[in-house]
Amino acid sequence: MKKKILFLGGAKHQTAPLIYSKKKNYYVIVCDINADSPGKKYSDKFYNISISDKQKILEISKKEKINGIISYASEVGSTTQAFVGNKLGLPSNPLKSVQTLAYKNKFREFLKKNGFIYPKNKVFSNYTECNNFIKKSATLPVILKPVDASGSKGISTIENLKNLKEN
């Protein structure tokens, strides 16, 4: 019986390990929110689901009796991979370590605690907190970035309070 590998994400830049796994005779399962994901054609089974939905991915992983889970070139999928891998006893990084690297607020706390230089920052739980801080304390411009987005996704530069919108 073929070993099963579940891949989190099937975007074009994620297809190389899918192709390799197929050549090595693995049963390839791909999960991607994009129903037309390029990786779909390289999979034995495809699930149209968000890779950030940890509980659903865990359910699928149990149902499929996977032997491994991979999040290739996806920061978003890395926490799901660690969560599922840890729950099922599969090779994986510790979830706490992955969360420290994936979430900017946790990473900055780690840097501060361990004596590293880190950028000045403030974490907000909601729009009102952010708005009040900027009105009372911040020197404009201010750069806002979600704690859980990778690269430049979700970055906003606030040059005046009119630019600040609730999202």
Predicted regions and their residues:
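Active-site nucleotide/adenylate-binding loops and adjacent lid/helix of ATP-dependent enzymes
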Residues: 103-167
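ATP-binding N-terminal substructure of ATP-dependent carboxylate-amine bond-forming enzymes
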Residues: 1-97, 128
